[in-house]
């Protein structure tokens, strides 16, 4: 049933109908559309459009429809209705007859869909926040179990300074905490109701929109009807949140793909999140992580696409805005799936401590310690930096780590170097000295774990 047929003398071309209809994707808003309709029926009682008995009949029928939708949402797709609003209204009329035709009084699909989408976004943000915190918790637990797993830290994908696997985990906890904060911030701006703004100029009925907003669980009602029906900032914000969050997950995946490789060998992934090759029997491929990394691109694309869709639209509503849903649904579904999968990857990961330790001892990751040692002996840092660079060249020539160079060889580069240099060059000393807040010392890592556990109520 079309909601707009009276103006037209010809039926829509079937090809246009297929092009125009949105039920195939906006059916996901069915529950929100029904909930919004119940609230609207209550508002219509306050302005005398519906009697209390009529409202009761409508609410009962809508609640029955809500249970039917929850039991089998796929039934909606069997309809040829234009959109979810048409489908709900048609089903309501089937249940209560002519009374169902009174429900849309004073309401437009413009404020209706804006409300539906905001309600859906609020619910989805809460799901994302839960999944985000679950992954943070998994990272904290993995960190706690691997505080003594020393490994090389990297810059430019070259070994730089020793860190611990726990410190690496906590780096991603920080990223995810920022993602959590962004979602919570987005939720604040989502929490205003556009219902009652009509097509663009507001409703002609003296409905208390603040009361209506409260019935729907919003903090308040929007302030301008033109903006309310054309606002899709919340879609852009959520897509931006998702794009940033997926960048973090993609980096997480890339790190672990490298750590899991034969070239690094720092971790082994569980069989539960890997697959094999149809040709090469020995292969164990990190498919879960590669898919997380790969799916990042589709989320970035959804954000870019929506920004391009909105950038040239005049006020107020335009049909272009129908394009807001498919990209949003897919992007947030993808982000949610990837958060869950990242937690599953951590659930079975094994850290290979001996291999991590060996790698941390290679690559002259303690060179900065020698420079700091020279500074403590009164050598200016820039000069110390140069001295250590020369010492590294000599160590490479001899095929030895810095700590294996004889004292006489080290003193060729600076006479201030003494026997006390060797304890300074140990991996444990490298870690212990990074004791400022946020550093990799065991004490700081333990404190960071405790802080994260307190924040996450673990």
Curated annotation (Swiss-Prot):
Give any GO molecular function from the UniProt entry: argininosuccinate lyase activity
Pathway entry: Amino-acid biosynthesis; L-arginine biosynthesis; L-arginine from L-ornithine and carbamoyl phosphate: step 3/3
Q: Which domain of life is it from?
A: Bacteria
As its record notes, the protein acts as a catalyst of:
2-(N(omega)-L-arginino)succinate = fumarate + L-arginine
- One GO BP: L-arginine biosynthetic process
InterPro entries linked to this entry: Arg_succ_lyase_C, Argininosuccinate_lyase, Fumarase/histidase_N, Fumarate_lyase_CS, Fumarate_lyase_fam, Fumarate_lyase_N, L-Aspartase-like
> What broad class describes the main subcellular location of this protein?
cytoplasm
**Keyword presence, Amino-acid biosynthesis:** yes
Places the protein is found: Cytoplasm
Is Cytoplasm set as a keyword in this record?
yes
Query: Which Gene Ontology CC terms are recorded?
Result: cytosol
Keywords in UniProt for this one? Answer: Amino-acid biosynthesis, Arginine biosynthesis, Cytoplasm, Lyase
In the Enzyme Commission scheme, what number(s) does this protein have?
A: 4.3.2.1
**Catalytic EC class:** lyase
Give the family from UniProt: Belongs to the lyase 1 family. Argininosuccinate lyase subfamily.
Specify the protein name: Argininosuccinate lyase
Q: Whose protein is this, by species?
A: Salmonella paratyphi C (strain RKS4594)
- Which gene does this sequence derive from? argH
């Amino acid at each position: 049933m079309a909601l707009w047929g009276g103006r037209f003398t010809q039926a829509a071309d079937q090809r246009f109908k297929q092009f125009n209809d949105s039920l195939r994707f906006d059916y996901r808003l069915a529950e929100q559309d029904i909930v919004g309709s119940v609230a609207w029926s209550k508002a219509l009682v306050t302005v005398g459009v519906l009697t209390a008995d009529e409202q009761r009949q409508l609410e009962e029928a809508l609640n029955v429809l809500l249970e039917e939708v929850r039991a089998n949402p796929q039934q909606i797709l069997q309809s040829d209705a234009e959109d979810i609003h048409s489908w709900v209204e048609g089903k309501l009329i089937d249940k209560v007859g002519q009374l169902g035709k009174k429900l849309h009084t004073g309401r437009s699909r413009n404020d209706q869909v804006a409300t539906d989408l905001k309600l859906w976004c609020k619910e989805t943000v809460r799901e994302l926040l839960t999944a985000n915190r679950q992954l943070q918790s998994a990272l904290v637990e993995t960190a706690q179990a691997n505080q003594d797993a020393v490994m090389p830290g990297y810059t430019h994908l070259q070994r730089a300074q020793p860190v611990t696997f726990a410190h690496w985990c906590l780096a991603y906890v920080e990223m995810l905490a920022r993602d959590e904060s962004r979602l919570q911030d987005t939720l604040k701006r989502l929490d205003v109701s556009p219902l009652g703004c009509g097509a663009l100029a507001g409703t002609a009925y003296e409905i208390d929109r603040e009361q209506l907003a409260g019935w729907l669980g919003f903090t308040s009602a929007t302030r301008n009807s033109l903006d309310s029906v054309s606002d899709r900032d919340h879609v852009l914000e959520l897509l931006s949140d998702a794009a940033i969050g997926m960048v973090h997950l993609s980096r997480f995946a890339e790190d672990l793909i490298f750590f899991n490789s034969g070239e690094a060998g720092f971790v082994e992934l569980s069989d539960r999140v890997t697959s094999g090759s149809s040709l090469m029997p020995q292969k164990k491929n990190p498919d879960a992580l590669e898919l997380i990394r790969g799916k990042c691109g589709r989320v970035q694309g959804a954000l870019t696409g929506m920004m391009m869709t909105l950038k040239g639209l005049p006020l107020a509503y335009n049909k272009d805005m129908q394009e807001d849903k498919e990209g949003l649904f897919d992007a947030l579904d993808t982000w949610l799936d990837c958060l869950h999968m990242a937690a599953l990857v951590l659930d079975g990961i094994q850290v290979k401590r001996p291999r991590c330790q060996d790698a941390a001892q290679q690559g002259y990751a303690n060179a900065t310690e020698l420079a700091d040692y020279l500074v403590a002996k009164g050598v200016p840092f820039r000069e110390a930096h140069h001295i250590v660079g020369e010492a590294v060249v000599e160590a490479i020539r001899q095929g030895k780590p810095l700590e294996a160079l004889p004292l006489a060889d080290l003193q060729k580069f600076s006479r201030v170097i003494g026997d006390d240099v060797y304890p300074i060059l140990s991996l444990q000393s490298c870690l212990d000295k990074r004791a400022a807040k946020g550093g990799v010392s065991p004490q700081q890592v333990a404190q960071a774990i405790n802080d994260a556990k307190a924040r996450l109520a673990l």
